[in-house]
């Protein structure tokens, strides 16, 4: 896309370089703009089937965890419809180039920033995925990836399938919330803080932050099937989406090259067991991950796509049943 072809929409930013790099070279992720919770109280977003559309891309870990939750819980497109942008973000923003005529069939837009500018003409942040749009009002109502899965797991329970797992059980909620903060700061966002760092000091600080936490998780998962014993929870979804991208994208693109996930016995077997669950596997697109990160999110002026790694290894058997017994969700 030439400079003449780049489209802008209101004041919406087109990259992380605008407003997300601090004076000391650290990457400081933007705050979410649309954070009204779903619920049944005044001022909350009504829990109503057919009213909302979720926009995602299989590149994005924040967006992918919404799809995993939908599939585990049985929230179908008759309840919340799903639109998908291409995995390579353009200079004009996330593009609906996978759809017929390059236009989302429900929202009628070509680029995601269009509806950000329409919803809030003064918005100066990036247009991000996941984004939840109220199709009745044709405006964004939530892009709070940090809390969205918990809404699907709780207040959207009337639309869960029979026998759906309780991913956010009441007796573990405070512990899940605490662990989720650690996973976010040291793993999910930790890889970005290393990858987008503008100084050697910030890169090294976050490099060590990520691998120190991976070492602790490796030890924990030697004795526990999931992060909370035998109970699959919201925290496992959050950890998985980073682990699934690590060897393909972060090891090379974000210079996190101390070890691959497949070099950790327990993290690797844990990751492959999760991948063996249809909800996780169906939401994981390794080609989209590779193209999105290595041809879009990282500097690659010649647009050369690496051939590796061999992601067929994700299909190989894991040892979790041998250690912990048959898998039950």
Which sequence ranges carry the predicted segments?
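C-terminal alpha-helical interaction module
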Residues: 1-329
């Amino acid at each position: 896309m030439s400079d003449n072809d780049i489209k802008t929409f209101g004041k919406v930013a087109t990259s992380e370089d605008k407003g997300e790099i601090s004076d000391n070279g650290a990457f400081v992720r933007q705050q979410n703009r649309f954070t009204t919770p779903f619920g049944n109280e005044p001022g909350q977003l009504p829990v109503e089937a057919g009213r909302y559309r979720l926009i995602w891309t299989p590149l994005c870990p924040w967006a992918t965890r919404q799809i995993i939750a939908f599939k585990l819980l049985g929230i179908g497109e008759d309840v919340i419809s799903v639109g998908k942008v291409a995995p390579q973000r353009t200079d004009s923003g996330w593009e609906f180039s996978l759809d017929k005529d390059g236009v989302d069939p429900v929202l009628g837009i070509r680029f995601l920033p269009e509806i950000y500018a329409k919803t809030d003409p003064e918005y100066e942040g990036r247009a991000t995925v996941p984004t939840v749009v109220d199709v009745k009002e044709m405006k964004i109502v939530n892009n709070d990836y940090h809390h969205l899965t918990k809404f699907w797991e709780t207040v959207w329970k009337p639309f869960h399938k029979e026998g759906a797992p309780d991913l956010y059980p009441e007796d573990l909620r405070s512990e899940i919330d605490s662990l989720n903060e650690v996973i976010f700061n040291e793993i999910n966002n930790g890889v970005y803080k290393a990858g987008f760092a503008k100084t050697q000091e910030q890169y090294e600080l976050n490099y060590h932050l990520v691998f120190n936490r991976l070492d602790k998780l490796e030890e924990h998962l030697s004795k526990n099937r999931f992060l909370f014993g035998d109970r699959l929870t919201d925290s496992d979804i959050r950890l998985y989406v980073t682990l699934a991208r690590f060897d393909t994208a972060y090891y090379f693109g974000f210079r996190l090259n101390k070890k691959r996930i497949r070099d950790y016995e327990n993290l690797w077997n844990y990751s492959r067991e999760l991948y063996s669950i249809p909800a996780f596997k169906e939401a994981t697109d390794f080609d989209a991950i590779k193209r999105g990160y290595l041809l879009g999110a990282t500097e690659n002026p010649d647009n050369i796509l690496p051939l590796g790694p061999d992601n067929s290894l994700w299909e190989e058997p894991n040892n979790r049943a041998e250690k912990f017994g048959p898998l039950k969700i």
